[in-house]
Each structure stands twice: as structure tokens, then as C-alpha cells.
């Protein structure tokens, strides 16, 4: 019983001590969801990379784009985020298009902290959507953490996290 309690205490210690930081460089080959997307793709046209940092280590990564509509493909997201960032405009929807973790529980924590950051600091944003692969793992992850399935597309699915 003590070992279990120690494991729980260790888990909550790292969760409480973690912070979300913006990254300008990652090893994209580590991305199990979209390794084909270059670093350059991930940091232009209002797209951002965030990492969940704990004890100087990045435990999870999420890549987001700002879009005016819900994209059904990476290509649509690319066009939408470019259009949303012309002439100082911004999209009203945050699209999390990849998330992965190096530590159990870090993916969930990253989604929730990113959602909070967006809600608190990006006042023009009114929705938090995913552009997820059509895999049981992605479906289970998002449903388990409270997202609602809003679209099933030919090559992807969209989930929406409540913004309240």
C-alpha cells in the first residue's frame, strides 16, 4: 500500500510542478501522430508548439494552429491558419493537431493546461478543437478526457473540448 501511495504522491508532485512553455525547436521525428510535418510548418502562420516542462525536462508536446473554421485535413488547416494570420487577423478556433507525451499523464495535463492558457490569454478564441487521426487510441484519449466527437472525416476526426 505504501508503494502505491508513494506513486500517487510522485504523480501529483510532478503534475503540480509542471508548466507550459512555448518551444521554437523540437525533434519532429519524435511525433508519433504527424512526423511528416516539418519544424518550419509548426511555427509559421500563427502556429505554435508548447511543451509541458517539469524539472527542466519536456514531458509532453502539443502543436496548435489558429483557424477561422474547423479543418478536416492538415492541408485545410494549413490554408486556414495562413488566411487567419493575414493582415493581423487571428482565427477564433484553436486546433490542436498533434499531442504526445514522454511521461504517463503528461498528454492529458498538456491538453488541459493549453486549454486554460488559451482561454486566459487569447481572448478572441472561442473554441478548442482537435484534428486527430482515425485511431482507437486518439478516440479513447479525447473521449476519456471529456471531449466530444464533432466530425468524422475521410482521414481524421475532430473533437471539441468544452471551453467553460
Task: Identify what each model region corresponds to.
Residues 1-23, 164:
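Conserved N-terminal entry element of GNAT/NAT acetyltransferase domains
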Residues 41, 117-125, 129-134:
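Preference for well-ordered, secondary-structure-rich cores of eukaryotic proteins
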Residues 101, 128-140, 153-160:
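Conserved beta-strand-loop-alpha-helix junction that forms the acyl-donor binding cleft
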Residues 143-153:
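Conserved acetyl-CoA-binding loop of GNAT-fold acetyltransferases
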Amino acid at each position: 500500500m505504501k508503494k502505491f501511495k508513494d506513486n500517487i504522491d510522485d504523480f501529483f508532485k510532478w503534475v503540480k510542478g509542471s508548466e507550459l512553455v512555448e518551444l521554437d525547436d523540437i525533434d519532429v521525428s519524435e511525433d508519433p501522430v504527424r512526423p511528416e510535418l516539418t519544424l518550419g510548418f509548426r511555427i509559421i502562420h500563427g502556429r505554435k508548439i508548447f511543451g509541458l516542462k517539469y524539472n527542466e525536462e519536456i514531458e509532453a508536446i502539443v502543436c496548435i494552429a489558429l483557424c477561422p473554421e474547423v479543418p478536416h485535413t492538415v492541408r485545410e488547416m494549413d490554408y486556414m491558419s495562413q488566411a487567419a494570420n493575414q493582415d493581423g487577423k487571428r482565427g477564433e478556433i484553436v486546433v490542436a493537431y498533434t499531442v504526445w507525451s514522454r511521461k504517463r499523464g503528461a498528454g492529458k495535463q498538456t491538453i488541459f493546461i493549453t486549454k486554460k492558457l488559451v482561454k486566459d490569454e487569447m481572448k478572441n478564441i472561442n473554441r478548442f478543437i482537435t484534428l486527430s487521426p482515425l485511431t482507437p487510441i486518439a478516440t479513447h484519449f479525447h473521449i476519456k478526457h471529456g471531449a466530444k466527437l464533432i466530425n468524422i472525416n475521410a482521414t481524421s476526426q475532430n473533437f471539441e473540448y468544452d471551453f467553460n
